[in-house]
């Protein structure tokens, strides 16, 4: 009611299951929100068994239409969401040659060119019900609330679908992003067919009008869960993700042999075999691999950054190419790489070792009993630490099961935890072991935990761009992390403790790029995206009917509508009238 919105109406929209009711409900609920007309198209389904329909209608919010609507009707929201006041500064941090190699970048339009990020992940609504969510955000935006930073594009139910289903969705996304790059209303639909005569889309397309005045948006990067990214971009060598031999899209790292990813050293052979743009483009084969900027027609550009030109001479953290590399658009994410990767292994190994050493007491009995008691005491200590430091956490109790040790001493120690909880566990363990120096192994364990906590703290406290001191901290912490982990792994030979995983290799690329570019990895890590996934999951809790994907999209747009309404009311209040908040052209 504080927003002037009838809550029962909001609830009615949240329960909306029928596409035919959606737009009416939303307009009744959020009258100031002139909604973009949902784009409807047909997607194929997996009908190999002859059961059900072979097609269904998919709905989407076209990125270029959402961009145009916000610019015309809600300029304050447009300015905030796309960070238009800081575009000049953002592009100024990108080396000139790198940005100018992007096929759609115009150096004369830096202040009006939005670097766009496409985000994707699947939402598990139930054990057998999953939806693929696609979102867009500005790469120049930083520390915005998740609901404002990430704008909805589509929600696709994955049950009954196959690769053709998502490819059709990506085809529409690619077409819309091309329109954004050009800044003009498209004259035809995604199939190249003319718009229905007399429609607003036909009128705008025929006129060749600008989407958002002088503003355009170019696709600059893609981020999300790596499983989704590998599928969506279509890395041929990573169709089985980390079970295949070639595991990296940026260099020649392999699972074993002379180019093994297990060498935690920037002098490792794989870092001398950097992917060329041409080899990268040849290794991807999906609709998203044809995104604007990927589908290079100019032959002079396909050799940009070839491996022989990018061979490192004085190899070390912070060395990277200054040119725009297509393979660099697929981002490694610190949340998935560290908090849901390296730190799970580090915390699991450290907790089990410290319990074995009697940090929380020594107990008799079988494996599960004695470690269960010690780990429960550790969990109590962790909760006390979080309370004392004002850290919110919902970490389940430490047990041999939550540490992956149900099989006994031969188990693989890996903490089961959500990303934020895992970072808090790392911080606690780093504090607990900071003075450990009884032996080299204890010192190295302390160094690993300190380095991980230091990196997390630096990324959380830094701005969009790292200062020289912050970059030096990242450089130092990364070297300590890699060196100490290598020694811990050698100490643990013959066990599964301190194992090296492909995410160590991903972290090396991520940290090297952060030091070189000064860009804070927190500006593109997936915490906000994961928050949106959680909100979407809760918005359809207990509802597993066919229209669940439409309901997720409806809920996302209602939230955006309320943000726009708040902005309009705030603008009207600041000038003492409602001028400027009136709805504009509807699409």
Regions found by a protein language model. Give the residues of each.
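Terminal interaction-prone segments of large eukaryotic proteins
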Residues: 1-23, 407-413, 417, 421, ...
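Well-ordered, non-membrane alpha-helical segments in soluble/globular domains
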Residues: 163-176, 180, 274-281, 368, ...
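Short, conserved catalytic/metal-binding motifs centered on acidic residues
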Residues: 121, 173, 244, 429, ...
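Charged (Asp/Glu and Lys/Arg) segments that form or flank catalytic channels of large polymer-
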Residues: 11-14, 19-118, 186-431, 435-436
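Compact, glycine/acidic-enriched structural inserts
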Residues: 133-191, 566, 570, 574-576
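Short coil/turn segments at secondary-structure boundaries
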Residues: 129-133, 148-149, 261, 538-541
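Conserved beta-strand elements of beta-rich interaction domains across eukaryotes
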Residues: 123-125, 139-143, 158, 249, ...
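Glycine- and acidic
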Residues: 148-164, 361-368, 408-415, 434-440, ...
């Amino acid at each position: 009611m504080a927003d002037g919105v009838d809550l029962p109406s909001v609830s009615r929209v949240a329960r909306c299951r029928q596409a035919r009711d959606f737009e009416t409900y939303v307009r009744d609920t959020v009258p100031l929100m002139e909604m973009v007309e949902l784009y409807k198209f047909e997607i194929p389904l997996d009908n190999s068994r002859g059961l059900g329909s072979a097609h269904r209608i998919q709905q989407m919010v076209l990125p270029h239409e959402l961009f145009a609507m916000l610019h015309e009707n809600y300029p304050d929201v447009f300015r905030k969401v796309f960070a238009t006041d800081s575009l000049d500064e953002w592009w100024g941090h990108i080396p000139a040659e790198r940005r100018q190699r992007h096929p759609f970048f115009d150096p004369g339009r830096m202040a009006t060119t939005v670097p766009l990020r496409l985000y994707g992940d699947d939402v598990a609504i139930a054990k057998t019900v999953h939806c693929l969510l696609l979102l867009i955000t500005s790469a120049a935006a930083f520390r915005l609330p998740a609901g404002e930073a990430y704008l909805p594009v589509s929600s696709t139910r994955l049950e009954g679908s196959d690769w053709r289903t998502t490819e059709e969705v990506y085809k529409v996304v690619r077409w819309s992003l091309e329109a954004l790059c050009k800044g003009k209303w498209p004259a035809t639909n995604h199939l190249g067919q003319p718009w229905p005569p007399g429609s607003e889309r036909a009128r705008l397309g025929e006129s060749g009008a600008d989407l958002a005045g002088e503003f355009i948006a170019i696709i600059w990067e893609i981020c999300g869960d790596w499983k989704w990214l590998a599928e969506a971009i279509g890395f041929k060598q990573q169709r089985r993700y980390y079970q295949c031999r070639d595991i990296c899209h940026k260099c020649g790292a392999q699972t074993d042999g002379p180019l093994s990813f297990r060498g935690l050293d920037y002098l490792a052979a794989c870092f001398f075999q950097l992917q060329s743009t041409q080899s990268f483009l040849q290794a991807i084969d999906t609709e998203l691999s044809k995104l604007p900027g990927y589908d290079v027609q100019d032959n002079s550009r396909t050799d940009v950054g070839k491996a022989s030109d990018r061979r490192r001479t004085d190899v070390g953290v912070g060395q990277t190419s200054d040119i725009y590399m297509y393979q660099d658009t697929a981002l490694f994410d610190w949340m998935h790489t560290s908090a849901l990767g390296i730190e799970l292994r580090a915390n699991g190994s450290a907790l089990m070792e410290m319990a074995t050493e009697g940090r929380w007491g020594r107990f008799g009995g079988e494996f599960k009993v004695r470690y269960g008691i010690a780990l429960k005491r550790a969990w109590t200590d962790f909760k006390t630490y979080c309370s004392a430091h004002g850290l919110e956490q919902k970490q389940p109790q430490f047990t041999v099961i939550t540490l992956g040790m149900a099989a006994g001493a031969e188990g693989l120690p890996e903490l089961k935890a959500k990303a934020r909880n895992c970072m808090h566990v790392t911080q606690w363990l780093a504090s607990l072991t900071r003075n450990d120096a009884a032996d080299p192994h204890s010192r190295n364990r302390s160094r690993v935990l300190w380095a991980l906590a230091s990196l997390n703290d630096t990324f959380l406290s830094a701005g969009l761009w790292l200062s020289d001191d912050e970059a030096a901290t990242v450089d130092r912490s990364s070297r300590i992390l890699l060196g100490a982990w290598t020694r811990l792994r050698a100490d643990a030979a013959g066990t599964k403790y301190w194992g090296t995983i492909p995410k160590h290799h991903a972290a090396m690329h991520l940290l090297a790029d952060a030091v070189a570019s000064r860009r804070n990895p927190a500006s593109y890590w997936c915490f906000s995206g994961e928050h949106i996934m959680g909100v979407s999951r809760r918005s359809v809790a207990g509802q597993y009917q066919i229209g669940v994907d439409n309901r997720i999209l409806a809920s996302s747009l209602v939230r955006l509508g309320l943000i726009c309404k708040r902005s309009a009311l705030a603008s009207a209040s600041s000038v003492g009238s409602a001028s400027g908040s009136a709805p504009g052209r509807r699409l």
